[in-house]
């Protein structure tokens, strides 16, 4: 019988002792496995996973390893379960947990910082100094499900209560898996960027973060919101999510198009989500003097950046890691 010291369960949500899971073998290899259902400890709950999204970072981990770090090294052949964009139902409460109730639908953030380092105390838990280290003890240190600890490619997972977001009944399971993806864009534009309603935003790259960045920018009152990309079907979705203008960079010069659409002076913000090698140099030419460029993606190779242009035009360039 599934149980643990001080753990609360309900007969309405029976929990097995073992579950099906995917584990990472060699690079590029996921294998089915049976694992014990984890038991929540203090400040944790057990989530029955109802839906999972697949992020491009999951594929990076599966095929290359980083940014996952298991036991201080590569994640291969360590019985590690990836996956970090998931939602589900709370089915067990760890000792003393009363912030959530059994049966409640939640979506999850990735990171539960160590809570002790300088960055965590500042609220920047995705920049936790103990990422992947955990002081040698996962109970004391940083957790990043799907990165430093088991993730969501399984039937059940334990999450710290600080990583949970309650979701309304009107939101579908599939939509809920993308809440934290939207949070990544929001973190870059508001918490770090300071976006004010009426300011102009360009989003480059209509992947999941980029498309949700369009929706977030529009909801926050940005005007206009311009989306650039290479695929008309993705640009069409961007229109549906609120983009005032879309630019297919295969058909026209992105910088020229953005400046034309914004009266020639450049925009206030660029949210760079493409990871293209030339993206930074294009972005710094899309923004107005004193504008801000937020990097939510990056190329795999080193790139040359026009630093003199950044300095002469007082452009702010910053990166974001995850949702907070």
Question: Model features per residue range: what roles?
Answer:
Residues 1-87, 151, 155, 159:
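Short N-terminal strand-loop motif that marks the start
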Residues 37, 73-75, 99, 114-204:
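NAD(P)H dinucleotide-binding glycine-rich loop of Rossmann-like/cofactor-binding domains
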Residues 38-52, 67-121, 126, 168-170:
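Glycine-rich beta-strand-centered segment in the early N-terminal region that forms part
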Residues 193-197, 220, 236-316:
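Glycine-rich cofactor phosphate-binding loops and adjacent beta1-alpha1 units
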């Amino acid at each position: 019988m599934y149980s643990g010291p001080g753990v609360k369960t309900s007969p309405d949500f029976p929990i097995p002792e073992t579950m099906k899971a995917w584990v990472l073998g060699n690079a590029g290899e996921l294998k089915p496995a049976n694992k014990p259902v984890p038991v929540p400890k203090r400040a944790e709950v057990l989530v029955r996973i109802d839906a999972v999204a697949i992020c491009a970072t999951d594929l990076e981990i599966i095929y290359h390893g980083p940014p996952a770090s298991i036991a201080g090294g590569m994640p291969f052949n360590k019985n590690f379960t990836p996956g970090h964009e998931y939602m589900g139902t709370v089915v067990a409460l760890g000792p003393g947990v009363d912030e959530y109730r059994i049966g409640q639908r939640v979506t999850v953030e990735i990171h539960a910082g160590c809570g002790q380092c300088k960055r965590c105390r500042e609220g920047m838990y995705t920049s936790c100094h103990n990422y992947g280290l955990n002081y040698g003890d996962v109970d004391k240190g940083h957790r990043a499900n799907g990165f430093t600890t088991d993730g969501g490619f399984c039937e059940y997972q334990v999450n710290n209560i600080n990583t949970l977001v309650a979701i309304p009944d009107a939101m579908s399971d599939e939509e809920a898996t993308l809440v934290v993806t939207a949070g990544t864009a929001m973190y870059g534009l508001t918490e770090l960027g300071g976006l004010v309603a009426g300011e102009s935003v360009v989003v480059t790259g209509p992947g999941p973060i980029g498309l949700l960045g369009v929706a977030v920018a529009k909801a926050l009152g940005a005007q206009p919101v311009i989306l650039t990309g290479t695929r008309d079907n993705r640009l069409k979705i961007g229109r549906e999510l609120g983009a005032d203008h879309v630019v297919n960079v295969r058909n026209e010069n992105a910088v020229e198009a953005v400046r034309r659409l914004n009266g020639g002076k450049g925009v206030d913000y660029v949210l760079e989500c493409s990871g293209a090698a030339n993206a930074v140099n294009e972005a710094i030419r899309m923004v107005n003097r004193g504008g801000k460029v937020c990097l939510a993606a990056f190329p795999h190779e080193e790139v040359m950046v026009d630093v003199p242009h950044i300095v002469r035009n007082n452009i702010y360039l910053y990166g974001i890691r995850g949702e907070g």
